[in-house]
Design a protein with these regions (language model features):
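Short, structured beta-strand/loop micro-motifs enriched in basic residues and often containing a Trp
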Residues: 76-85, 239-246
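Gly/Pro-biased beta-strand-loop elements
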Residues: 131-225
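Sec-dependent N-terminal signal peptides of Gram-positive bacterial secreted proteins and lipoproteins
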Residues: 2-26
Length: 266
């Protein structure tokens, strides 16, 4: 009986043994197919760079077509009156030609109520000026400038499209040296200036509101660039003006015409 069981066991082994390589081969083939579907790569994928990057909000800009200002010279102050009368006290001053003022109402007595900011105190004020001093003009349509204080950058536009970006230094936040926000227009210019008060000067100045200028990084009394001040581009550092690298100040000086709108914002 035991002999018969042994013979049957050997017979079964003989029948199934040739099938073992076939089973193993199919399993190996399946593994190879899976490996081909998921190739191994040594390339590291930067998930952030793979995401679509948003376009700069500054790539296009629509500028105002006109602005209203006080029609006196760029360096002449106008008193803003507390009430619409010649003998009313002054509550502030505004310089002419380059700074936008908002007209609230025109009165019958020859005065107009305006909203603006006081050049001395840097505070927003609301008062009265002679209506005859108000003038509205069209702004230059070819170029436009935006100063972004939070970014410390100057954006130059041609036909509302961004063409240049300059790193800048605007006014410090303390001691009333900050650069005031608002709408201005480009005025007169000069090759250089020197301020004995601050012991500094600069090249290629372009006015946008009385003593507020675009100009190069400052130089000392010997007309040498002050390197520690030049190194501050990209952060607030000036007495209110907009400092630029020398080559950028020169480009603006040579290319941006009078009457070009300037928007200074956060």
């Amino acid at each position: 009986m035991n002999f018969i069981k042994s013979v049957l066991f050997v017979a079964v082994l003989i029948l199934i043994f040739p099938l073992l390589p076939l089973v193993a081969g199919e399993q190996e083939q399946d593994i190879n197919i899976i490996e081909e579907k998921v190739p191994v790569s040594n390339e590291i994928i930067d998930e952030e760079s793979a995401k679509p990057q948003p376009e700069s909000e500054e790539e296009e800009m629509v500028f105002p077509r006109s602005m209203t200002f006080l029609d006196v010279s760029e360096i002449t102050p106008v008193d803003i009156k507390e009430s619409p009368a010649d003998d009313s006290k002054s509550i502030g001053i505004v310089y002419g030609k380059l700074m936008h003022v908002d007209v609230i109402q025109n009165l019958e007595n020859g005065y107009s109520e305006i909203s603006t900011w006081d050049y001395r105190s840097m505070r927003d004020i609301r008062g009265f000026v002679p209506t005859k001093l108000l003038k509205t003009v069209e702004l230059n349509k070819k170029y436009g400038i935006v100063v972004a204080l939070s970014q410390q950058k100057v954006y130059i536009y041609e036909d509302n499209a961004l063409i240049k970006t300059f790193l800048c230094s605007s006014g410090l936040d303390d001691n009333n040296y900050f650069t005031p926000k608002g709408l201005y227009r480009i005025g007169e210019r000069g090759e250089s200036f020197f301020s004995p008060k601050y012991g500094q000067g600069a090249y290629y100045w372009v006015r946008f509101n009385n003593n507020y200028l675009f100009h190069s990084v400052p130089f000392d009394e010997n007309r040498n660039i002050i390197e520690e001040e030049a190194a501050k581009l990209g952060q607030k550092a000036s007495h209110g003006c907009i400092r630029l690298a020398i080559e950028d100040a020169l480009w603006l000086y040579n290319n941006i015409p009078q009457g070009t709108p300037v928007i200074i914002k956060d």
